[in-house]
């Protein structure tokens, strides 16, 4: 009988849980309220900070609480061009400036936005990584829908009430610089999770992995595996719709 393979061990957590001790906190938009739905609310960028394990910087933005006499600090993903002391306006009637938060229905076609909500009020789900952005393709006022192009190139239709931040997420070009050394990769993943270094299955013994063993390193069978396979067999291309080289012109789904 074989051993418990790596992906089975990951499911149990333990040493594979993410390293969150040095994180600044969850980066989200403001909770959707009356001020944002019908007008705007003003905040100020107090600080731009590094977040461990994240490629993009974070901005700590302070808003007045609309219901109580106090200040509320929100953590936004910083956009390129945002600076400390800058006023951030959030709401339907906010101006079209970098860093401001607006519903997609109030943003003209061709505008670049980031940290876009998938559903109104979820506080940001799309285009959140460094250098990422979403492009507004068009609006359908009759159905209150907006069509956008995601960083992957796929197109998606979402509600025009979903909010986004004007501009591109800061930290673009991060992946263009090669790591070059194993030591740099070590420090990178030390703050993320236990996912490095990753031993190949064909380099293992047959007891450790479905691809292990043999007089030379080869998988020895088709690497596609069914969705209904038991967890100890799930290694390789799991439930792949297709495999191999993409030939000809690629079409993005409309």
Curated annotation (Swiss-Prot):
Report a single Gene Ontology molecular function: rRNA binding
One BP annotation, GO: cytoplasmic translation
Q: Which GO terms describe its cellular component?
A: cytosol; cytosolic large ribosomal subunit
Subcellular location(s): the record lists:
Cytoplasm
**Could you give the subunit structure recorded for this chain?**
Component of the large ribosomal subunit (LSU). Mature yeast ribosomes consist of a small (40S) and a large (60S) subunit. The 40S small subunit contains 1 molecule of ribosomal RNA (18S rRNA) and 33 different proteins (encoded by 57 genes). The large 60S subunit contains 3 rRNA molecules (25S, 5.8S and 5S rRNA) and 46 different proteins (encoded by 81 genes).
Q: Where is this cross-link: Glycyl lysine isopeptide (Lys-Gly) (interchain with G-Cter in ubiquitin)?
A: 46, 93, 119, 145
Any other noteworthy remark? Answer: There are 2 genes for uL2 in yeast.
**Matches recorded under SMART domains:** Ribosomal_L2, Ribosomal_L2_C
Protein name per UniProt: Large ribosomal subunit protein uL2A
Record-linked InterPro entries: NA-bd_OB-fold, Rib_uL2_dom2, Ribosomal_uL2, Ribosomal_uL2_C, Ribosomal_uL2_CS, Ribosomal_uL2_dom3, Ribosomal_uL2_RNA-bd_dom, Translation_prot_SH3-like_sf
**According to its UniProt record, which protein family does this protein belong to?**
Belongs to the universal ribosomal protein uL2 family.
Positions carrying Phosphoserine: 52, 95, 159-160, 249
Q: Keywords assigned by UniProt? A: Cytoplasm, Isopeptide bond, Phosphoprotein, Ribonucleoprotein, Ribosomal protein, RNA-binding, rRNA-binding, Ubl conjugation
Taking the first listed entry, what is the main subcellular location of this protein, grouped into a coarse class? Answer: cytoplasm
As for what it does, the entry says: Component of the ribosome, a large ribonucleoprotein complex responsible for the synthesis of proteins in the cell. The small ribosomal subunit (SSU) binds messenger RNAs (mRNAs) and translates the encoded message by selecting cognate aminoacyl-transfer RNA (tRNA) molecules. The large subunit (LSU) contains the ribosomal catalytic site termed the peptidyl transferase center (PTC), which catalyzes the formation of peptide bonds, thereby polymerizing the amino acids delivered by tRNAs into a polypeptide chain.
SUPFAM superfamilies noted in UniProt: Nucleic acid-binding proteins, Translation proteins SH3-like domain
């Amino acid at each position: 009988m074989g051993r418990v393979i790596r992906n089975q061990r990951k499911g149990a957590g333990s040493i594979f849980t993410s390293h969150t001790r040095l994180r600044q906190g969850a980066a989200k938009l403001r909770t959707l309220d009356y001020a944002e739905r019908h007008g705007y609310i003003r905040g100020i960028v107090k600080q731009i900070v590094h977040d461990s394990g994240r490629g993009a910087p974070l901005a700590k933005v302070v808003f007045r609480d609309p219901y109580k006499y106090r200040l509320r600090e929100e953590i936004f993903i910083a956009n390129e061009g945002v600076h400390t002391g800058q006023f951030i306006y959030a709401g339907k009637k906010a101006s079209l400036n970098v860093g401001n938060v607006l519903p997609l229905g109030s943003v003209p076609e061709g505008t670049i936005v980031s940290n876009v909500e998938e559903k109104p009020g979820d506080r940001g789900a799309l285009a959140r990584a460094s250098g990422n952005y979403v492009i507004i393709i068009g609006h359908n006022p009759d159905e209150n829908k907006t069509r956008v192009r995601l960083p992957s190139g796929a197109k998606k239709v979402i509600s025009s009430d979903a909010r986004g931040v004007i501009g591109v997420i800061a930290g673009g070009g991060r992946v263009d610089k090669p790591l070059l050394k194993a030591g740099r990769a070590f420090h990178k993943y030390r703050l993320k999770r236990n996912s490095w270094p990753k031993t190949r299955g064909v380099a293992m013994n047959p007891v450790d992995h479905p691809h292990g063993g043999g007089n030379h390193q080869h998988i020895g069978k088709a690497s596609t595996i069914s969705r209904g396979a038991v967890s100890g067999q799930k290694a390789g291309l799991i439930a792949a719709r297709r495999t191999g080289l993409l030939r000809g012109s690629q079409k993005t789904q409309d």
